[in-house]
Regions:
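Extracellular/periplasmic Venus flytrap/periplasmic-binding protein
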Residues: 17-19, 27-134, 169-173
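Structural signal for hydrophobic
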Residues: 10, 32, 56, 160-163
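Short clusters of hydrophobic/aromatic residues that line enzyme substrate/ligand-binding pockets
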Residues: 20-21, 160
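General beta-strand structural signal in soluble alpha/beta enzymes
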Residues: 10-13, 72, 87, 141, ...
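Extracytoplasmic "Venus flytrap"/periplasmic binding protein-like
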Residues: 1-12, 22-24, 109, 128-137
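Extracellular/periplasmic periplasmic-binding protein-like sensory domains
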Residues: 26, 130-174
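Short glycine-biased active-site loop of nucleotidyltransferases that positions the nucleotide triphosphate
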Residues: 21-22, 103, 151-153
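Ligand-binding clamshell of periplasmic/extracellular solute-binding protein-like
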Residues: 1, 13-20, 116-124, 141-150, ...
Length: 174
C-alpha cells in the first residue's frame, strides 16, 4: 500500500493465523503452510481416535495465533468428540520463563491431553515444566519438533509429542 507501483509478493513461511487468508486476505500474500484451522482439523481427527482422552487442556500464547488455535480446538473437539475442555489459558508471549504454575494447573485439572500452539522458548519452557511436573499425557502441538524442544522432552517425549506440520518430519535427535 505504501508503494502501489512497486508491488511485492509477501511469501509467508510460518504465520498460520487463518485471518491472513480469510478476512485479512491480500492478493499479494502467499502462504506455504496450512493455517491453524486446517492443522487443528487434522489434530482432532487423531484425538477423536484416542478413546482414553476424556479431558483436554488448551494452553497458548496470547496473540492472534494462540487465540486462533484455541478457537479451532474448541470448534473441532466439539464437532468430533465428547471431550471436556478443562482449561483454556493464554499466557504472555515470550515473557514466561517458568511454566511450573501452568503445569500444576494442567495436572490439577485432570487433563488427559494438552493442545498448544506454543513455539520457541515458550514451547521449550512449557515442555520442561510439564516433564519436571510428572505429566505423562500426550501433547498435541504445531511447533514441537525443533531440536531444542525435543531435547527438552528427551526420552520422555517419545510417544508424548504429537505434531502436525510441514517441512522436515523428524528432528535430528530425540
Amino acid at each position: 500500500k505504501r508503494n502501489p507501483d512497486k508491488r511485492v509478493i509477501f511469501i509467508n513461511y510460518s504465520a498460520v493465523d487463518p485471518a491472513l487468508t480469510n478476512d485479512k486476505c491480500n492478493f499479494w500474500h502467499f502462504r506455504f503452510d496450512a493455517n491453524a484451522d486446517i492443522k487443528m482439523d487434522a489434530i482432532t481427527d487423531v484425538i477423536a481416535g484416542v478413546p482414553s482422552i476424556k479431558k483436554m487442556y488448551l494452553i497458548g500464547q496470547d496473540y492472534s495465533f494462540g487465540k486462533a488455535v484455541a478457537a479451532a480446538a474448541e470448534k473441532y473437539l466439539a464437532q468430533k468428540t465428547s471431550i471436556e475442555i478443562v482449561g483454556n489459558e493464554l499466557h504472555p508471549i515470550g515473557k514466561v520463563k517458568d511454566f511450573t504454575p501452568y503445569a500444576r494447573k494442567i495436572l490439577a485439572s485432570g487433563a488427559d491431553g494438552v493442545i498448544t500452539g506454543n513455539w520457541g522458548a515458550d514451547m521449550v519452557n512449557l515442555g520442561k515444566s510439564l516433564s519436571e511436573s510428572g505429566y505423562k499425557g500426550p501433547v498435541y502441538c504445531y511447533y514441537c519438533a525443533s531440536n531444542g524442544i525435543t531435547a527438552t522432552f528427551g526420552e520422555a517425549g517419545k510417544g508424548m509429542l504429537h505434531l502436525v506440520g510441514e517441512g522436515l518430519q523428524n528432528p535430528s535427535r530425540p
